[in-house]
Amino acid sequence: MADSKGSTSKEGLSDWCILEAECSDLENDFEQLFEQDTDSDVSDLLDNGELEQGNSLELFHQQECEQSEEQLQILKRKYLSPKAVAQLSPRLESISLSPQQKSKRRLFAEQDSGLELSLNNEAEDVSPEVEVPAIDSRPVDEGGSGAIDIDYLSLLRSSNIKATLMAKFKESFGVGFNELTRQFKSYKTCCNDWVLAVYAVHDDLFESSKQLLQQHCDYIWVRGIGAMTLYLLCFKAGKNRGTVHKLMTSMLNVQEQQILSEPPKLRNTAAALFWYKGGMGSGAFTHGTYPDWIAHQTILGHQNAEASTFDFSAMVQWAFDNNYLEEPDIAYQYAKLAPEDSNAVAWLAHNQQAKFVRECAAMVRFYKKGQMKEMSMSEWIHTKINEVEGEGHWSDIVKFLRYQDVNFITFLAAFKNFLHAVPKHNCILIYGPPNSGKSSFAMSLIKVLKGRVLSFVNSKSQFWLQPLGESKIALLDDVTDPCWVYIDTYLRNGLDGHFVSLDCKYKAPVQIKFPPLLLTSNINVHGETNYRYLHSRIKGFEFPHPFPMKPDNTPQFQLTDQSWKSFFERLWTQLDLSDQEEEGQHGESQRAFQCSARSANEHI
């Protein structure tokens, strides 16, 4: 009999029911279930230790970098390699001596953090196809198509922004930026005139700058072609490059990298014609009158004929009238006249400026010396005190002499003989202790009368007395024993008022009489028997008291040019000085000295 299919109900064969799961109320408590079920057929299936972040993030970062680098190399092979040389220079391949192959030095660069690589990629040149057209850009001034493509990306990605701007400037204006300007390397150097080339200026800001700059400038020249805008600004006050950049960046809302700035060429006729001709066109905006450096080179006038020839006599006349005797003063002051004086402009353009300055100084000294010799002492004093400006009081000198216990009447009598160079009375000695005001008193007199000072330190030279032949009055300050010995030995005839032979440099000895000679010393020569032969030749006055000072450390007695001017005017008659109206012939007025070749009645 075949076995029946299915299960059987016999109890002896139903052991599987014993293995069934037991029901419990805790069947949903998974945490308790897992805690109780510790028996497992798989060992160490679960790790109950603390979790740690491995290096999976670093691995992911490396994989991303490798993928980015691979994509970048593919793009560089596709776009940059065929145009690397063309972007550097279109003519580089034709003049290259190396094989015609592209440089791939940086094409397969080593792996890096990615920062430097990204910066290098941004610095690469971009092909002309990658251009962003400007929206509402300005129309081309001369025959343009109207719409202009402004290559913003080429400027941002260029490794040499200045070279890129200069190339775009030359492309727009047809002339190099350096052909119109001279270079200032320092940012702190000030200049009144500046040439600015600004890239990618917004139209509204471009138009507003024409009005805003008028308050800062005397002359404005503005023109925009394409993306480039050219400014010529003549500021009212000198500005350095940093100040100009700060002004333009705030006014035009541009970055400093978008600006080229240099001062213009002032002596270049071609550059001046560029500004002059450009300002006459309709595309340029100008405000104000032409600056002098443009007008002088482009505008013809009667000044051009005068400036072409240098008149040496006019330079000598100018130096004589202004009392310039030294070469540095003549050169500097005459150069300052160049903007107004056409003869000074011609002198600056001459290649023998130093020669003319030396000859001018020599001629002025000759004229001044001849004029001095022709004048009497009265006329000389009158001329010099008239040159003093301001007013003083003669009582300061009188009070100082009385403070030093000097009899003013005696001093006035000796001073009168001193000024007239009376024989054996033409030398006055002021002696006394130190800090008594001897040198201050003597120097103030020499200063107002434009006298000369002798220094015994030069006594080793045989020409140390030469200033005595070139002055109306002289001073020998701080005479010591060696100097007294020299005077007692060699200068007795000069103090007597006789002619002496004076050795002068670069000429034969000349015959002169000593001018009035003023001495200061700490030694009373009248109390020294060794110098008894000088007692009758020198009139001495003692200053025994220290020079008085105010609490603010200023002199109590004002020994100034104004005080001496008042002194001579007040005591002119007592000093027996002649009336100036009687100096001329029959009261006729004397006209000013003229040493120029121009006639007196010539038209100005």
Swiss-Prot record:
GO MF term set: ATP binding; ATP hydrolysis activity; DNA binding; DNA helicase activity
GO biological process assignments: DNA replication
Keywords: ATP-binding, DNA replication, DNA-binding, Early protein, Helicase, Host nucleus, Hydrolase, Isomerase, Isopeptide bond, Nucleotide-binding, Phosphoprotein, Ubl conjugation
Region annotation Disordered: where it falls in the sequence: 579-604
Classification via Gene3D superfamilies: 3.40.1310.10, P-loop containing nucleotide triphosphate hydrolases, Zinc finger, large T-antigen D1 domain
Residues that hold ATP according to the record: G432, P433, P434, N435, S436, G437, K438, S439
Residue list for modification Phosphoserine: S81, S89
Short sequence motif named Nuclear export signal, residue ranges: 88-97
Record-level GO cellular component terms: host cell nucleus
One protein family per Pfam: PPV_E1_N
PROSITE patterns cross-referenced by the UniProt entry: SF3_HELICASE_1 (PS51206)
Reported modifications of this chain: Phosphorylated. Sumoylated.
Domain SF3 helicase intervals: 406-556
Localization, UniProt: Host nucleus
InterPro entries noted in UniProt: Helicase_SF3_DNA-vir, P-loop_NTPase, PPV_DNA_helicase_E1_C, PPV_DNA_helicase_E1_N, PPV_E1_DBD, PPV_E1_DBD_sf, Rep_E1_papillomaV, Znf_lg_T-Ag_D1_dom_sf
Chain positions of motif Nuclear localization signal: 76-78
Cross-link (Glycyl lysine isopeptide (Lys-Gly) (interchain with G-Cter in SUMO)): K513
Catalysed reaction equations from the record: Couples ATP hydrolysis with the unwinding of duplex DNA by translocating in the 3'-5' direction; ATP + H2O = ADP + phosphate + H(+)
Metal-binding among keywords: no
Polar residues composition-biased segments: 591-604
EC number: 5.6.2.4
Root EC class: isomerase
Family per similarity comment: Belongs to the papillomaviridae E1 protein family.
Assembly mode: Can form hexamers. Interacts with E2 protein; this interaction increases E1 DNA binding specificity. Interacts with host DNA polymerase subunit POLA2. Interacts with host single stranded DNA-binding protein RPA1. Interacts with host TOP1; this interaction stimulates the enzymatic activity of TOP1.
Function per UniProt: ATP-dependent DNA 3'-5' helicase required for initiation of viral DNA replication. It forms a complex with the viral E2 protein. The E1-E2 complex binds to the replication origin which contains binding sites for both proteins. During the initial step, a dimer of E1 interacts with a dimer of protein E2 leading to a complex that binds the viral origin of replication with high specificity. Then, a second dimer of E1 displaces the E2 dimer in an ATP-dependent manner to form the E1 tetramer.
Listed name of the protein: Replication protein E1
Source species: Human papillomavirus 12
Taxonomic lineage: Viruses, Monodnaviria, Shotokuvirae, Cossaviricota, Papovaviricetes
Gene: E1
